[in-house]
């Protein structure tokens, strides 16, 4: 009899399905990038996902954030994300934390989550640095997303050590700040595409975004984590 994970089971086998069910992942940020990552993790049958995001849904999120519809505008992102995840897989355990994380404000938070992997899909540099510092200190695997705004080519996204990143302004800042903190290596997702100059700014302070680059970035992050957990290697 077919069930939700039948096609994935054909691909990886029953034992790997159980591995995914036994896996816990923390997802920091459930917006454009994080929403894509969440979708992939839930549909892959990951057993427990901890979602951390302290924001609410705005009308401007509709163009790129998978959890967003007109019906959810104004709602808290973590609650909408949880409802969507459970509507896809009622068996997934979803824990939510409606906070804007930084270690100074929430000491010991990441350690308390007891997860196998951390995905950083947030924008704030101070929070990204906190997440990476704690994860590296505690030997928790973590992958961090660099900038996805002002770009049109998702095929130019790639995963590499932060020291091999280029072109991305956020990655440049992260390289500098991580070096200051004595962190020599960190896996990141970044774009080799030179950011496009916005054609209209109005009162905007954030970069422009399209419908496809942020979610694809999220899927790539999730794909890397899932391959790592499943011990999939390229043929």
Segment roles from a protein language model:
Residues 1-25:
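N-terminal charged helix/coil linker that caps or initiates catalytic domains
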Residues 27-29, 52:
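Conserved N-terminal Rossmann-fold NAD(P)-binding element of oxidoreductases
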Residues 42-48, 137:
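Conserved S-adenosyl-L-methionine
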Residues 46-89:
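Glycine-rich phosphate-binding loop and adjoining beta1-alpha1-beta2 segment
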Residues 98-106:
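Conserved SAM/SAH-binding loop
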């Amino acid at each position: 009899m077919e069930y939700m994970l039948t096609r994935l089971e054909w691909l990886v086998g029953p034992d790997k399905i159980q591995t995914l069910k036994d896996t816990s992942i923390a997802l920091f940020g459930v917006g454009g990038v994080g929403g894509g990552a969440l979708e992939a993790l839930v549909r892959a049958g990951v057993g427990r996902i901890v979602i951390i995001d302290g924001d609410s849904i705005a009308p401007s999120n509709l163009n790129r954030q998978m959890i967003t519809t007109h019906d959810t505008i104004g709602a808290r992102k973590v609650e909408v994300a949880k409802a969507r995840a459970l509507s896809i897989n009622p068996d997934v355990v979803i824990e939510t934390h409606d906070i804007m994380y930084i270690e100074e404000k929430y000491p010991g938070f990441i350690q308390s989550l007891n997860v196998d992997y951390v995905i950083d899909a947030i924008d704030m540099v101070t929070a990204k640095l906190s997440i990476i510092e704690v994860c590296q200190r505690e030997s928790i695997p973590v992958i961090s997303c660099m900038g996805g705004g002002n770009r049109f080519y998702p095929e130019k996204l790639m995963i590499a050590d932060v020291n091999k990143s280029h072109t991305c302004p956020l990655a440049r800042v992260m390289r500098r700040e991580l070096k200051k903190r004595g962190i020599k290596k960190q896996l990141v997702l970044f774009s080799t595409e030179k950011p496009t100059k916005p054609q209209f700014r109005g009162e905007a302070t954030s970069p422009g975004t399209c419908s496809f680059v942020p979610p694809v970035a999220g899927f790539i992050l999730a794909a890397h984590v899932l391959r790592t957990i499943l011990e999939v290697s390229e043929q």
